Amino acid sequence: MNRMEAEFSNLVKAYRKRHMGKGPERVTTTFCKSWAICEMAGNLSPVEKFMAKTGDGRQMLRTARTEMVKEIYKDHPPVEMEALLGAKFIQLFVDIDIAQDVGMSVFVFDEDLEKKFGTRNG
């Protein structure tokens, strides 16, 4: 991660904590074209881990941790992320593996972040 990707990761953690009550323990961000791809580990609270012991609980958590997250970003646009990147937030794609407690979020912006911040090594 370069400096901008690390700063973006910190904003994702803070945003999730502020709007969901608990942020991920670790966030790793990679800029690729107009995407900020975030891998997040340690997302679940102790209560959610308990709920994940049943099939119904896992399904409910997966729905909450994907659909609810997208709704939160619609209702509360990530203005701090836009300000950091100087780009407009367009859309969010989210998925989570409840058993492994690892989530992925792909933030789509209106500019090529990879070109803007020179994040490729090849």
Annotate the PLM regions.
Residues M1-G122:
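Interaction-mediating elements
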